[in-house]
Amino acid sequence: MSRCVITLNAGSSSIKFALFREGLTQEGSAKELTPMAIGLAEMVGEERRITVHDGAGAKIYEVKRTEHVDAPFHAEALRRILAWRQSAFPDAEVVAAGHRVVHGGVHYSAPVIVTDEVLKYLHTLIPLAPLHEPYNIAGILGAREAWPHVEQVACFDTAFHRTHPFVNDVFALPRRFYDEGVRRYGFHGLSYEYIVRRLREIAPLHAAGRVVVAHLGNGASMCAIRDGLSVASSMGFTALDGLPMGTRCGQLDPGVVLYLMQEKKMSAAEITDLLYRESGLKGLSGLSHDMRELEAADTLEAQQAIEYFVFRIRRELGGLAAVLKGIDAIVFCGGIGENSRHVRERVLEGMEWIGVELDRSANSANAEVISSERSRTRVFVIPTDEEGMIARHTLALLDQMAAA
């Protein structure tokens, strides 16, 4: 019987999940993972719903509940996901659940089996990723309760960036803070890792070269990659740094925080809420965190929010190209990167100095390659697959344990 793995990406009021089956390629020479189902459990107001699509994108299951439920969202949702899986795929041998965990701190540079000791350490990282880590942990606890006999594997967004040289990890603070773990971690590592894997399949020469990847979504960051390894990232100690995001401010003069504390008398909790939940595109536009709504809006504030978003991407692109001492390829991924032709066009405008010439018709069609044939630097649009990477890591870790 083929092994199956469930992947979970838990947020505050949602759980993205997927069921993968391991099999052999048509040639029978290598193992491959096939997505059997991809779903979303979410809570909107008092309504709790689960929607599932098959690997081809067709909806195969949907259920909604509006009555009051006393059970915590994550625990109740995972029990319902388990019940659906047992009904829809009764013969699937689920050997593990793989979890996206945003922050792994200094201790974890590779996936690990979740133990009580691991969970204890992850709790200490909540202040570094308050929008994600508490809910990642809640997802793990809910999965443990729902599936007590299934291995739980934590896969970290920070792990891919542990190849950074010291100079790209350190802050100009007294050295003791670095030794205590105050350093640049970088995030979206599972996404970047998948992009490297996919690039090796479709453009191996570029994958072995100097690549800048822009993961642009509600969370946004950029990464410089050389020979498939992370060299530098726009994010730092927390997932707040770097590019402006849907509701997060991105790069900010630390003096602004001191001003808010000293002059505005704002508490740490108030500043946290401001920087994580009320800033970014939402704060600048006064309208929405959603790029689609901003592109459709005709207000000056919405256009200025987009302009600032593009400006920061262009500035980061130039800096990362300098870190790499040149650039062979650019990759756009994430919800905005994959779908907003306007953002991509504005980011690449005037980038001939790094060898980019845009094919406007290909860009408008969201083609896989959007640079012209004359472009020295190749530009790709590649849908990312964090769930697939989690599944691969999870099964690989089980294989390592079995071989030990």
Swiss-Prot record:
NCBIfam families given in the database record: ackA
Family annotation (SUPFAM superfamilies): Actin-like ATPase domain
Keywords: ATP-binding, Cytoplasm, Kinase, Magnesium, Metal-binding, Nucleotide-binding, Transferase
Organism encoding this protein: Methylocella silvestris (strain DSM 15510 / CIP 108128 / LMG 27833 / NCIMB 13906 / BL2)
Cofactor note: Mg(2+). Can also accept Mn(2+).
The protein, known as: Acetate kinase
Residues that hold substrate according to the record: R100
Domain of life per record: Bacteria
Entry GO terms, CC: cytosol
